[in-house]
Amino acid sequence: MFNSDIQYYMRQQHNIKIGETTAEKIKIAVGAVIPDLDEEPEPYVVNGPNLMTAHPVEAAVTYQEIAHCLDKSIAKLESSILHVLELTPPELYSDIVENGIFLSGGGALLRGLAKRFTEKVNIQFHVAEDPLRAVARGTCIALKKTSNYSFLMR
């Protein structure tokens, strides 16, 4: 989702064609979801063919641009989070409010994501320790203790 947003943005705003790999590199280098960061990454320089001439061109992409181009997708996620919270049983909801929500996966590394979600939802969001491996580690723990999680095995 985010990589295709970046590819589309680069076509529309910089008239440059980039692939999935380059979009991923941009996301890692300058990926952000808020326009004001305390620690600003340097702009990321992208090379690719101009869409009109096919001549090679270079474009410097800033984190503010990426925050702008990801805004609609992040807003959809915010809406989904709010919807899920509306459907959450009260007992679980109080645990969530008390402990917060932990973000995992590569998207959790987008600069400002936890802050933006916290401000939108009014519940503390945290980036999991080692977010790229957090789900796999949690699954491993659950599989070792399946008796504790029998309610999940339906």
Residues covered by each model-derived region:
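Active-site phosphate-binding and catalytic loops of NTP-dependent enzymes
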Residues: 16-20, 86-93, 149-152
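Glycine-rich phosphate-binding loops at beta-strand->alpha-helix junctions
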Residues: 35, 93-117
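Phosphate/ATP-binding catalytic cores across multiple sugar-kinase/actin-like superfamilies
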Residues: 69-97, 142-146
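Residue-level signature of catalytic and energy-coupling elements of molecular machines
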Residues: 6, 81, 103, 139
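Phosphate-binding glycine-rich/basic clefts of nucleotide- and phosphate-handling proteins
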Residues: 1-71, 82
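Short, charged, low-complexity patches
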Residues: 3, 7, 74, 129-136
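Conserved phosphate-binding/catalytic loops in two-lobed NTP-binding clefts
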Residues: 115-141, 149, 153-154
